[in-house]
Amino acid sequence: MREILLTTHHENPGLPVEVHCHGFDEVDFSEFAALDLVLLDRKCAEENVACIPTLYLRQNRLAEFEQFMQRYRALRVAGRIPHLVGIALEGPLLASHGGTPAATVWAPTRHEWERLARLGDLGLVYTVISPDAFTTASGLYDNLDDRHPRLDWIVPLLMAHGVRPALGHFTKADPQGAAELVRDIVDLAWQSEWTGSGARVITDHLFNDMPLNIKHAFRTSAARAKRESTLAAYDLPNWTLADMDQIAGPVPAAIMNEAAAGRIAACINFDGEHVDLAIAARAAGLMGHANTMLMTDRCDSARIGGQELHQTDDNGLWYQDGGIVAAGSQPLARQMRNAQQMGVADAPLWQLVAGTAHRAFGTGAPAELATAGEAR
């Protein structure tokens, strides 16, 4: 693989960023009380990447997580973990938990949201939330009451502490309604006071855990036998943002159009298993590589968030019981090679793996996302 402006300078804008990952080697990041941050930083240095560890959080461990964030902040201030450029949460406010451990999906109360938001001052850079978390189809709905504030209160609170909502884990009940909620949250984020730098809104991985009109992945040998004919029918070269609502569905269309407008930094996986590589490459081109981040969803061991995982002979994904995808296994370097094999040139590849992330999280180049100037 050709090196794409890679250096070993701490937080250099050219250092690739593992934006959303769950575990390196045998370490499950969600076991944060025992997480050796200095050792993890050393591992990142060996791989020549910056990293935003993404953790799952159980409700009864919020106080422990606050202590962890204090420890993270102290090490950052001391300059001991320069490669760990932020911490992220997946959840807890998820309408559909998908591969997320069910015990880590919960609806915080007003006071719990205030505690979570304050962690932005210590380095919490985003938390995955579902725009449709408060709809009747949400898995959280039956447990909601007047103690639980809605998104019109939550989003401005997060903005005030520099914590980005990362949109994902949609139900499939009302695609059009969910797309409207995406636009509502983006509008709200851009209208709110923002104390951070870079992107105000990001996403979980595009095409995963959301309602779709297309088959986005071919994970078994039987599915792969039909891949070429399926993709030919999709006519990827003629996809446009204007038609994406009909092609892929209202939710991916809303995300892709907001990203192309520079109002979202969108994440997409290039392992070829979460999303087919041809679809991923076309989507990134439509949104603009300067508005798109390659995320790995990586876990190196058969355990995540306290749950045991397994793999199959068909692909390298990690699965929960019941055949639900929980995480990927391919590191950033492998996914960079995948993107290159799809014809992504050096300059846009650098944006996918480094430039967009450093702008989005305010760790490198100018803060505002670029409006896509690429083919629509």
Which residue ranges define each predicted feature?
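Active-site mouth loops of central-metabolism enzymes
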Residues: 21-35, 99-108
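N-terminal hydrophobic targeting/anchoring segments and the immediately downstream early-domain regions
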Residues: 2, 9-15, 43-49, 71-75
